[in-house]
Amino acid sequence: MSGYHSKLGGTADTYSSLSCLWQGFSIAFKEPRPKVAGEFKDIDADGAKARSTFLSKEGDMKQSFETSKLYYGFPIFILGYQDQTHGYNVTTCSSSYSLGDWLVIGVGSEENAADQIKHYQKFTVNIPDENLMLEMEQAGFISHREKIDKLGLDFRPSKLTQAPILDACPVVLDCKVDRIIEEDGICHIFAKILDRLAESDLLDDRGHFKNDRFAPAYFMGDGHKRVYRYLDDRIDPMGSFIKKARKKNDKS
């Protein structure tokens, strides 16, 4: 079971080091850090457990809590890749972010997925909804074995990358590796998105994504307990709150 923990969200713990990793990606953040009340200390005595303590000013209602990890909401996806032994394979992940045509995912260095992606340099990010939760969990718990046939997942190889595109996942990103940075047992995989695929009912007549129709599951929790969270039907267009505030100010 420990292997499942390392796959499903396990790499989110390392994102505190991404400021350093971005330097390898030729991006540097030059703006000074904002000042905060109190003092932030990182304590890591033996590397086995990291603790953070925030010494707040008097009257601050927040309190520090000790935990080995904190996942504040990451979309779950099924990572598809070619496998030298099994032909095609999948595993479950939750550590990713995307900017423009770039995608960064985190995978444990000792995992089969990391070895295979290093070899083939290509993969797919298959994003399920709540209808595929059983298969999603099974893909995470089973380790170093063939999983696509075992789980009964229908797929087709991508024409661009030959990585598996899962039929049951409404949204898929087809990706090619640009570079891999390994740190503290984690492979941070920087990739270019070659293609974005979505089921037809998620696109309008002009080919625009219907944001209110897609509801991926999110991974959330701490060292004590991890859970899945789901989206509801509420949406607000980007910038709508500023527009409302301006209208309110204009009336006053």
Please report, for each region that a protein language model flagged, where it lies by residue:
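Short linear segments in intrinsically disordered or otherwise low-structure-confidence regions
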Residues: 6-7, 32, 43-45
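Residue-identity detector for glycine
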Residues: 3, 9-10, 24, 38, ...
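Intrinsic-disorder-associated, low-complexity terminal segments enriched in Asp/Asn/His/Tyr and depleted
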Residues: 4-5, 13-15, 42
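Basic, polyanion-binding surface patches
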Residues: 52-252
